[in-house]
Curated annotation (Swiss-Prot):
The enzyme's E.C. designation: 2.7.4.9
Origin superkingdom: Bacteria
Keywords, alphabetical: ATP-binding, Kinase, Nucleotide biosynthesis, Nucleotide-binding, Transferase
Top enzyme class: transferase
Reaction(s) catalysed (UniProt annotation): dTMP + ATP = dTDP + ADP
The protein's name in its UniProt record: Thymidylate kinase
GO CC terms in record: cytosol
Signal peptide: none
InterPro entries the record matches: P-loop_NTPase, Thymidylate_kin-like_dom, Thymidylate_kin_CS, Thymidylate_kinase
Family to which this protein belongs: Belongs to the thymidylate kinase family.
Gene Ontology terms: biological process: dTDP biosynthetic process; dTTP biosynthetic process; dUDP biosynthetic process
Residues at which ATP binds: G7, I8, D9, A10, S11, G12, K13, S14
Alphabetical list of NCBIfam families matching this protein: DTMP_kinase (TIGR00041)
Length: 211
């Protein structure tokens, strides 16, 4: 089982994903739960070096180069972590995946959507999540969280304006309409409230999942 979590920066997806992993460990005690993230991946030196480069405020790169770097890190992530884990029958939860590239590089940065989609289909060999959970949060709330928790330490990708994030959200809305396995969850509540919404949805969704 492969589940990705999506949302704009400071949407709470990282925290909620970790909480959801604890729920899955109880629901599926016989399964190993693997949590990971993009860009980068847990303990993947090369992919994490790309992540550090992408997030650094000191690096000024074009949207096209950004797209290629994300794709490169994703391929490493797949080869070294995601594919082996799925092959071993583990449940993989990933904080960001291909949909982030479409929403951020495609809609946010204005690159051709078909180009971004085709590139990521190629490098992933059409490996897509069984389920994608998109935490839909107001931009004002996300910016409030960024200010409270990160102050002046925002990275290059977080340090963008409202107009950019509006485009990104439009991208996620596009994906929600296009992909039958892409589901929107209200992310404006507390972490526990959002987790309850996800668990309630997952229980119903998994009950109808082909076994």
């Amino acid at each position: 089982m492969f589940i990705s979590f999506e949302g704009i920066d400071a949407s709470g997806k990282s925290t909620v994903m970790d909480l959801f992993a604890k729920y899955l460990k109880i629901k599926f005690p016989e399964k190993e739960i693997v949590t990971t993230f993009e860009p980068g991946g847990k303990n993947l030196k090369e992919a994490l070096q790309i992540r550090e480069f992408l997030l650094s405020k000191n690096n000024q790169i074009s949207p096209y180069v950004e797209m290629l770097l994300f794709a490169t890190a994703r391929r490493i992530h797949l080869e070294r972590l995601i594919w082996p884990a799925l092959k071993a029958g583990k449940i993989v939860l990933c904080d960001r995946y291909i949909d982030s590239s479409i929403a951020y590089q495609g809609f946010g940065n204005g690159l051709d959507i078909d180009l971004v989609t085709s590139l990521n289909s190629l490098i992933s060999e059409n490996t897509f999540p069984d389920l994608t959970i998109f935490l839909d949060i107001k931009i004002s709330k996300a910016f409030e969280r960024m200010g409270i928790f990160r102050d002046h330490n925002r990275d290059r990708l977080e340090n963008r304006g409202v107009e950019f994030y509006e485009k990104v959200i439009n991208g996620y809305e596009f994906l929600a309409k296009k992909n039958k396995n892409f589901f929107k969850i209200d992310g404006n509540g507390t972490y526990d409230e959002v987790l309850d919404l996800i668990i309630d949805f997952f229980e119903k969704y998994y009950a109808s999942w082909p076994k």
